[in-house]
Amino acid sequence: MSQNTNESHLTGLTDQEVIASREKNGVNLLTPPKRPSIWKLYLEKFQDPVIRVLLVAAVFSLIISIIENEYAETIGIFFAIFLATGIGFYFEYDANKKFDLLNAVGEETPVTVIRNGKIKEIPRKDIVVGDIVILNTGEEVPADGMLVEAVSLQVNESTLTGELMVNKTTDEAHFDEEATYPSNSVMRGTTITDGHGIMRVERVGDATEIGKVARQSTEQSQEQTPLNIQLTKLANLIGKAGFTIAALTFIIFTSKDLYQYLTVTEVTDWHQWLEIARIVLKYFMMAVTLIVVAVPEGLPMSVTLSLALNMRRMLKTNNLVRKMHACETMGAITVICTDKTGTLTQNLMQVYEAQVDESQPELIAEGIAANSTAFLEEKVEGEKPSGVGNPTEIALLLWLNGKGQNYMKLREEAKVINQLTFSTERKYMATLVDSPIQKKRILYIKGAPEIVMGKCNLDKAQIDKYNEQLLAYQNKAMRTLGIAYKVIPENASDDCAELVGEGGMTFLGIFAISDPIRPDVPDAVKKCQSAGIGVKIVTGDTPGTATEIARQIGLWQPEDTERNRITGVEFAALSDEEALERVLDLKVMSRARPMDKQRLVQLLQQKGAVVAVTGDGTNDAPALNHAQVGLSMGTGTSVAKEASDITLLDDSFHSIATAVMWGRSLYKNIQRFIVFQLTINVVALLSVLLGAFFGTALPLTVTQMLWVNLIMDTFAAMALASISPSMDVMNEKPRRRTDFIITPAMRNNIFGVGLGFLAILMGLLVYFKNLPSGMDTHHLTVFFTIFVMLQFWNLFNASVFGTNHSIFKDASHALGMLSVAIIILVGQILIVSFGGKVFRTEPLPLNEWLYIIGGTSFVLWIGEIWRGIKRLGNK
């Protein structure tokens, strides 16, 4: 049925009108989100709090280097800074390039328009306001506009409202007053699922609805990531501790030496002043050394390396991470706000159940095949099935396909005499065919069950039985469809509407159709809930449908009440104070609009929640952008993907649970690295400080510490970052944002092990100092090597910190650690053998190497014994 405006003939715009319209209203292109320049992307890496502390240390080191004309230490510190920032920049830049390939926007898609009275195809980007566009089934609407003609037109608005099927018409009598957008309007980015129409373009590019949402999605969220907050606190702590100890050391030692010098010497000429300057400079250098030793130069690079390695490995689990911090932030999330269509469900209508007359399988098959305008697309094995046309009709064809029936063969063999397409007014579709199966002319009808049953010969008992079944389906938020047929005499009318109106049809049964939940979703939701993560469904669907989906995935429980669900309109009516009181209790928000979802995210954040948002539509973009982690779908719109941090390539909620596991495991690995790293810094700092009190030469130089803090720690970070994630972390509750990254157990380990190492090293230092020949470069080389080897063996203990596992329990884990350990050991041998003046070392004989390696290995064995005792205690 066609609905026309008063215009009987549409000629479209002339060439001159097209040019004028483009000048006045702009082009049909969405302004892409402003991407930071390459330099800005790189400079962002200097916002890392530990990098900033390093920069301060580098400035002090540079001052000393200029005075002494020895630049090795300063170069080392700057190398540390540029290496850490460079790695972070490279991996984010690389991810952005991959993302751009994934998100190629089809602005060249051809669109059929009427211009100069002729039908022609032009690229989507060339559409202008005033253009007359012809819309056919399966096509995407290229701009916003008003319909001037609509024939059985149905539109998939899920990218904007979450609605899969919206009826469109130009007949005011059939306008849907509750629709999000007027019934005679169509929006850019939506898809024609059934029928066809003609529209007049009213808005293009950024002026379209999709353009407005895209603009809101580029507003930057000011939320700091949980890891960033913790690293800032850690950097402040290290910075304050390092600078305080350095300042006190400088004041105490300078005061002592100056007092001793000035009590015996009278300052009369510049020679004495030069000696005073030498004393001040000597202890200023010591203070700078203490700062450099206190600051873990390798920490930012190691964290970056851990994040970067996780980015790569998460890609294998269908998580394309675009923003590096998102790897870890996923481990801290406390709430997931997810849309329904395509994330929890398969975004493919399917027959849930068929109550049909099983004695008539051939008639049912022919009726479904012939009385349909939909098509199934050819797919390779294993690929998700899909079709073109009405989603309900596609569901019936898929059901038929599953029965081993070839719908195309049946459709081609049944000669269509007449067809009455579905309309919202009639609520049925009818097709008259010459049936090769029955060798008769048959009228097939399908539509709303109550309409179809009204045309059939059914008694009250049969109608009551079907109505009871229909009510059960509708309570589960399913669509229902009835089918019937009638044999038509050859000399009868071939007007479908007239034949249906006569009644007397035979009812063949009912179908219950739904967009089924993904099979892995209930388990994934359960995992998230056991991990202490709240799941909230935010959808444009009806309250009934949204609640039913929540029930099916295990989110909605029998004890839940109206307090646990709300509609978008009701939510918008609440004040911020009222909404804040309810947000944590909400499980379902239905009829939600884009701004409702964004407001929900921001209110949850005000309550202290760390929020992840999933979405595939343009309507999800503002919320995706404001959440701590935005998760878009691989098949989602370009606007949604641009606003997100992670793209789920398989569109599955299950991948979110996997990402949480990765994030939590990554945080534990970073904590393990901090245990390893800070043990080194505590030992080094106190060694230098106590060495000064004992009156020895600086036991560790800045260049030696840069080797330990940079190169050795980089390999250690790689080893710890490569530890496989464990499902055990999903049994824990999310960490609180206020919890410091260094836990009491970590603090005890750092100072317990550190003080043990310090006692050994100080004993060694005192022994060397009291030798008759005194302490020389050989002794300092032995001291440096023992210091490194103690940390070397402690790396193995750090890799299983937080567990009672033996390092040898997992062969692949032990092998990975061993390969890194060999690299570190070879590096230490090379530095000792060839470091010379730069590293203040000299080569050691083989027997000393064996004594040092064997003697320091007690660190590993004590760790193994301690974990073994704890395992026995837990039995």
List each model region and its residues.
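Hydrophobic alpha-helical transmembrane segments and their immediately adjacent juxtamembrane loops
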Residues: R736-I750
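Long hydrophobic segments that form regular secondary structure
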Residues: V766-Y767, L771-M775
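Conserved cytosolic headpiece of P-type ATPases
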Residues: M1-K733, I741-I742, L755, K769-N770, ...
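A loop-to-helix transmembrane entry motif
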Residues: T777-F787
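Alpha-helical transmembrane segments of multi-pass integral membrane proteins
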Residues: N749-L764, M789
